[in-house]
Amino acid sequence: MNVLWIIALVGQLMRLVQGTATCAMYGNCGKKSVFGNELPCPVPRSFEPPVLSDETSKLLVEVCGEEWKEVRYACCTKDQVVALRDNLQKAQPLISSCPACLKNFNNLFCHFTCAADQGRFVNITKVEKSKEDKDIVAELDVFMNSSWASEFYDSCKNIKFSATNGYAMDLIGGGAKNYSQFLKFLGDAKPMLGGSPFQINYKYDLANEEKEWQEFNDEVYACDDAQYKCACSDCQESCPHLKPLKDGVCKVGPLPCFSLSVLIFYTICALFAFMWYYLCKRKKNGAMIVDDDIVPESGSLDESETNVFESFNNETNFFNGKLANLFTKVGQFSVENPYKILITTVFSIFVFSFIIFQYATLETDPINLWVSKNSEKFKEKEYFDDNFGPFYRTEQIFVVNETGPVLSYETLHWWFDVENFITEELQSSENIGYQDLCFRPTEDSTCVIESFTQYFQGALPNKDSWKRELQECGKFPVNCLPTFQQPLKTNLLFSDDDILNAHAFVVTLLLTNHTQSANRWEERLEEYLLDLKVPEGLRISFNTEISLEKELNNNNDISTVAISYLMMFLYATWALRRKDGKTRLLLGISGLLIVLASIVCAAGFLTLFGLKSTLIIAEVIPFLILAIGIDNIFLITHEYDRNCEQKPEYSIDQKIISAIGRMSPSILMSLLCQTGCFLIAAFVTMPAVHNFAIYSTVSVIFNGVLQLTAYVSILSLYEKRSNYKQITGNEETKESFLKTFYFKMLTQKRLIIIIFSAWFFTSLVFLPEIQFGLDQTLAVPQDSYLVDYFKDVYSFLNVGPPVYMVVKNLDLTKRQNQQKICGKFTTCERDSLANVLEQERHRSTITEPLANWLDDYFMFLNPQNDQCCRLKKGTDEVCPPSFPSRRCETCFQQGSWNYNMSGFPEGKDFMEYLSIWINAPSDPCPLGGRAPYSTALVYNETSVSASVFRTAHHPLRSQKDFIQAYSDGVRISSSFPELDMFAYSPFYIFFVQYQTLGPLTLKLIGSAIILIFFISSVFLQNIRSSFLLALVVTMIIVDIGALMALLGISLNAVSLVNLIICVGLGVEFCVHIVRSFTVVPSETKKDANSRVLYSLNTIGESVIKGITLTKFIGVCVLAFAQSKIFDVFYFRMWFTLIIVAALHALLFLPALLSLFGGESYRDDSIEAED
């Protein structure tokens, strides 16, 4: 008896040593419904399961791993192990790329189902009856160690699922953000959706009353575990570290290095300047150019104010004399043959007008406006469109409540009706609707509608439950799939993660039809939305594919330009009046008509060469040419008036010819400087800007020709018929302002130089603060509906634009090339495309996981994913999805597929399996390539010639963001020297200019300044004065640059051309004064001070009246333009130019010339004023 007791005791001890089972569940006891799953039977803790059979043990090892090989007792039957295997295989296609996550996932459910100590961490809390009237588990608690759960979640959270361009966690964990959400999703009862057949509640901190239980805390593997290491794309810890990017901005504290250097240099120069000024003042004891109470006559400046480089020259300027003689003959021919000149002019205008009406076209396509067809990015866009199809036509609508949450049940009801009408009923004039044009992921799919309504598949939810349902769908989008079967993340639909408190929701419709039918439907959509009655407190903004081009074309400021013309005409009529106050109405009209004629001639001439105009050219060029062209009319007319005063014995023709001889070299010099600057601007490759520069150049040339011929003829005819007798007398009244106010300011010329120099150096400090970009809201009229849309995109859109990495000419049938692309396998190159892009997500604007078709293709072949690549047994025929599993076998057998890529197809096999994959649907295998990748590859029977790998930028909310995103795309795509590839995104083509805009700006402005110096040196025959002219123009541009930073004028191709134009206009302010200072009558004193006074006496009035005030009046009108692009880039820049250039020309330049000006030449063509 004792022996039997001892044997029994030993047996019990052996069972304990070998792991006697403590079960909570064992076996299956039936279903809750006909279509439900088999549910386990609850068992008491005293229950002892039988020893595992060899067959069950072998199956358990196959499913759960080698560590189960020695297990003799388990809390599961063979049927449960089979069911466990089937359920685990559902998750394998999603997480098998990360062995650590897969191992942890399998371990959790293997222990939950079969562990011998199951009863120690599983507590059944609810039992129900099956259809067979047996007890079945309905709800239970699992006690889980929180550290184990956290490491489990961390091993899985970054696994990418390329087919959705998202994360596997979105599918297996409902988008969980932490381990508790992850396990809650896994444990929530979802029997009809393929989830848990009963409720599993995971608990992490045992309460006092739960101390009898133990926490599940088996071995867990990190994603960078040596044995189960995951690929870089799925595990940040496994990734190599990229070299840090060089910071392109040098700063010392908050200051750019350039600004700090300028400040230091400025401080040193300022000390020397004040010392110089103080010593000069002390030495001269306050001496000035003129006595405060005496108004000087020409040549009466204080001789103590000597030029630093004073020299005298009584020679004539040979080049100036030749030009004067040439244009004297032109003027003589014009006054002697006025009718021939005018008839020829009218005939030319008629011919060019005919050409315009017959052949001229306006360029309105935004792409053709902003990107050169020779641009690399334009060619890349063409390549993408030709090979992968044009990007979707996008219709996007924002519904916004700026004061509170946008969502209420009333809003839902209203929007469900609106959206249903748009997608189902709204039709164009051709009876074409959204269903006829929309994007469908597959041929048998429904239309893609990216809207929160699709969480409910377009059916209005119940009033009592809509908030709860919407929140659940927002947390777990995979549970609320729309009819097109793609999860919709909340960042795509709402302005905030807290969707019930979001201020806006976004609806996006996608069209793939790029025909006139799509245009007409979009026009109908636009009409409908503009007339849509919106509930109180809400507003909508929207954009259709045709909106931008249409609104740009509606940007009509012709009335503003017309008013500008009228204002300058009225001013010209007044400013050209005679000394007795009588106006010269005809001359004012003539000047205006000549400007218009030059524009017409230029447009017709360029039309012959196929150069298209744009709306901006049509609206801005007239103003620009009027602002430039009217100046020469003032110069000619004022010089003629001076001849009338000084040479009354001359005939009218002689006075006009003399005026032309005197002013023509100056006019030609200014004309060449301006046209040269405009031609330099033509080097900008952006078509709108390039064409603008060409039109400006040709218009200025025609304007100059017509002014020196047609206007001269009109002036001759007008003066002869008016029979005007010159009034002579004292000119002190007329010149009193200049002689008392202006010249007194000039007496402080050293102080003026110090002030302007300080201004210049201060401006240099601000230059690094100039921002790059061209805000889209500036390009459209301010009353356009697109203004609100662009603002809402920046404020409320939480998804960034897509990026496509296009790889060409790479033979992917070879293993070595496959390893340059892949990311999910252990032998992928360390710096493969997938690995580098995974790392770039952490430091660049590209933040979405890469949709890597090659990885998905190879994962599709994984035999563990037995619903993916299948062949009919014994044949090479593909098993259709509906074919029973027993009649199919996986393409690769167990053991022939490995994460080290051994056995992966190459050569001909690669293309054969590719054909199977690319035609496979996503159901039942999510890795099937047809839906996500059917348009991502260009291939034939032997090779893949090109393919795209999709990712996306983070939300871009400013022009700076867009520029940085473009730079990132270019930088990353160029970091693979062994690959023929480029990055493409629909917006890239508009940001090409910014890649080299900074250096280009310096080159073009520098070239323009050098050109001015060269031309002025040729005309003036004086290096020193030419240098001072170029210096003053440089200072004008630098000061304008600083004001651009302060006034919020960004640098882009438009403002760059304006800067070049500013160089040309800045020359106009200064060049006539410099030439008048250099070429003087023989009777004028040759010292610098006397020449400055002579220049201001003769040219100063024309600069003020003909140049400064004319431009000021014309520019001010632009402030009332509808388009902000006029306000910012034309009104602000040109207004700034007028003020800055006038101050420099009328104050700084005379002071500079009087101190440092070059030698003079005698002008024998005129006599000095008395």
UniProtKB/Swiss-Prot annotation:
Origin: domain of life: Eukaryota
Recorded GO CC terms: endoplasmic reticulum; fungal-type vacuole membrane; membrane
Family affiliation: Belongs to the patched family.
Residue positions the entry lists as glycosylated: 123, 145, 178, 314, 401, 513, 900, 940
PANTHER family for the chain: NPC INTRACELLULAR CHOLESTEROL TRANSPORTER 1
The protein's role, per its UniProt record: Involved in sphingolipid trafficking. May recycle sphingolipids between cellular membranous compartments.
Origin species: Saccharomyces cerevisiae (strain ATCC 204508 / S288c) (Baker's yeast)
Membrane-crossing residue ranges in chain numbering: 260-280, 341-361, 556-576, 585-605, 616-636, 667-687, 698-718, 752-772, 1000-1020, 1027-1047, 1054-1074, 1099-1119, 1133-1153
Comment field (misc): Present with 521 molecules/cell in log phase SD medium.
Gene this chain is encoded by: NCR1
BP GO terms, sorted: sphingolipid metabolic process; sterol transport
Chief location: membrane
Keyword Phosphoprotein: no
Covalent S-S links between cysteines: 23-75, 29-41, 64-110, 76-114, 98-230, 101-156, 223-235, 232-239, 438-447, 473-480, 822-828, 868-925, 869-891, 879-888
Domain SSD, first and last residues per copy: 557-717
Full protein name: NPC intracellular sterol transporter 1-related protein 1
